């Protein structure tokens, strides 16, 4: 009897251990796909790849970034929303998730997702070619006023964050400019560096490489303070224009992902956000790390959606 009990106990122990092992390894069993709604080389792509490469060691599997571009981000946003809710496909959601519906570019809103974390925020700049005939924002405004409707400001898609940034600046400065849309910031920055357009209204992170190479100059940033890495760049407010504006970026899941899988993903990406290697990489990219947990991010999305609508109505950009 004693031997039978010992055998039964041993069997139960082994079964229980095996069961526990299986439970702890249910997710992830394979690599994860992270959808980026914007093109390679832009600020969204750069910060997403940085956080994913760090999160891999905490998640215990590979995270492959897949760029699905077009429609002011709506193609990528839809791909995230429509993904199978098994935790193996998620993606980065950005400001345009909240601006697209106001233009009729999407038939869904932030409510179609379960927000995981906020990753970063990024202020817009007004950037021009290095040898442009204006060296200050005031000189650029004077140039625009002397050439109404002829100055081209490049940004991302119509109604995108950088388009709105340019619109806010133009409205505040009282200038008439022509907005030139690109499918992401990278193309716009290349165009201004090559002298094909007069200016761009994109983030500092997105002009950094061209700025460091001496191909462009930043006239002002739409932030509350000067950038630490470039203290000579004035804020828009210092230049006489009360404009603070920029994008936000976070990670979203399709509705229906289980609480258990969400918890695993949340833990991995939260640890990644606090990882010194990620923080250093973000700093080198001139990206502002702005962490919000799922609950705080959800509230932020709601408030930002309503505020974005009000701003777009003010600029006449709503459908």
What spans do the regions from the language model cover?
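Hydrophobic helical h-region of N-terminal Sec-dependent signal peptides
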Residues: 6-14
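C-terminal motif of bacterial Sec signal peptides marking the signal peptidase cleavage site
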Residues: 16-19
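Short, polar/charged alpha-helical segment
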Residues: 44-60, 163-171, 210, 276-277
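A ligand-binding cleft/hinge motif common to bilobed small-molecule-binding domains
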Residues: 95-104, 168-172, 199-231, 309
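Hinge/capping helix and adjacent helix->loop/strand transition within the periplasmic-binding protein
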Residues: 82-88, 102-187, 236, 248-281
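C-terminal lobe and pocket-closing loops
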Residues: 207-274, 303-306
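An extracytoplasmic/periplasmic, membrane-proximal ligand-sensing/linker region
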Residues: 29-31, 171-173, 177, 257-319
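N-terminal (or domain-start) structured segment
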Residues: 21-111, 150, 175-198, 289-291, ...
